[in-house]
Amino acid sequence: MEPIIANPRACLGTGLVVAAAVLVIWLVTAGADGFGLVSFLVRFLHVLAAMVWVGLIVFVNFIQLVALRAADDQGREFLHKAIVPNVAWWFRHASTVAVLSGALLLLLAGYLAPSLVYGTGVYMPPPRVWLVWLGVIGALAMWMFVHMYIWPNMQVVLGIRPGDDAAKAQARNRVITFARLNLIFAVPVTFAMVAAAHLY
């Protein structure tokens, strides 16, 4: 057990193995439905990626930015080398996986081209459709914040792209602004997506 606990990747792998075992038990007891299984696995991937993405939005706004503001130059340099690049990597890739899996899920659920999936039109209650598309538009805006504003400016802050002190200060302010916007959007987007599936 200790080798697993000592390695976060081993912990994640163990969790995935346990989840796979639960899925196998379900398939044995309930039977297999190929299309339903694919839809579920895409949804599961989408939820996992969204959890990481929103979790990191909370981390960046309430922990990372606060720590960077409070740290001295030496502490800030350490955070920029050891923490911020890793957070940015997970942030970017989780957002992309969430958006791509979400797009695939829209197709599988019949919100996009239902006749291609089901062979006929699929009725979706208008309130549910509006909630889903509200979430989609908000999520795409959040993804754009990450890849078009936060990451390019973060590269200047981290010294990956050239910039003098004034450019770094301006880039830092832009990162904070769009990180805050991501936090604002995260709550209604999550609400809309969950409500579309579960709000009676």
Q: Residue spans of the language-model regions?
A:
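Polytopic transmembrane helical bundles with strong interfacial aromatic enrichment
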Residues: 1-200
